[in-house]
Amino acid sequence: MLRLSDIYSAASAVRGKYSGGTIMSYTVTPIGYVRSCFKEKFAIPRQPLLAPAAQGCIELLPPYDQADAIAGLEDISHIWVIFLFHKTLEDTPRLKVRPPRLGGNKSIGVFASRATHRPNGIGQSAVRLERAEPGRLWISGIDLLDGTPVLDIKPYVPYADSLSMAHNAIADSAPTLITVSWQPNALQQAEQHAQRLQQPLIELIEQCLAQDPRPAYQQPTPERMYGVQFYDVQVRWRYLTLEQIEVIEVCLA
């Protein structure tokens, strides 16, 4: 039987070991990489499942590209993807961050946010598993940059992972969406590229831009143009007001 005194003694020993400068370190090896509709960080939804039309796949590396590694996934609708924020790795630790949800000006502790600047650069996202085949997992509702290294995959377990009693005063509900409108020629361009790509491009653009991707501290004017690449197309838009975006152009990147 494990006694509390044993736990306290062990904790003291660990503190003593760390205070002496001996800290455990380890390396991780990706099990695969994400192939995503998002080619740059800007305009990626700040949480998973906010843009159901955002699709991609996880390309698994050997030995995890074999059928044995995915056996049973056919009975699972959603998975947790554990990944590396490979574009925001830093040598200097950040103790406080400025989350967009608080306007980009207020700081909170790094452990109270899901900011990409993490102590070990590790992130996790719950995404929908569309289908699985040896070497590839097709997923949607993603918030993952193309080329993201995947460290692990775990099944989403509804009774354990959905906590009805949980609360978060900082982000207790999904952000308010803003209106997305189209110039006629831009909508026609998007329809043509959607047909060529065989992807829900119009829905992707609307769902991502409705999240208001601009930095929270910016006060855009109608003259200022924004742009981002989805798949192989460049999308350009402007803010008619702080609550309305107008898509101007959708063209090959």
Where is each model-derived feature located?
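A conserved acidic, glycine/proline-rich C-terminal tail/linker
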Residues: I202-V228
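Short coil-to-beta-strand transition motifs
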Residues: S25-P30, H117-A126, Y231
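Arg/Lys-rich, positively charged N-terminal/basic patches that mediate binding to nucleic acids
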Residues: L4, Y8, I23-A67, L73-D75, ...
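N-terminal amphipathic/basic-hydrophobic helices that include classical n-h-c signal peptides
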Residues: M1-G20
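Short solvent-exposed strand/turn elements
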Residues: A132-P158, V250-A253
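Active-site-adjacent substructure of cysteine-protease-like catalytic cores
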Residues: A69-G123, Q211, Y217-T221
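Enriched for short, Lys/Arg-rich terminal
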Residues: L240-A253
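Conserved positions in beta-strands of structured domains
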Residues: R35, V127-E130
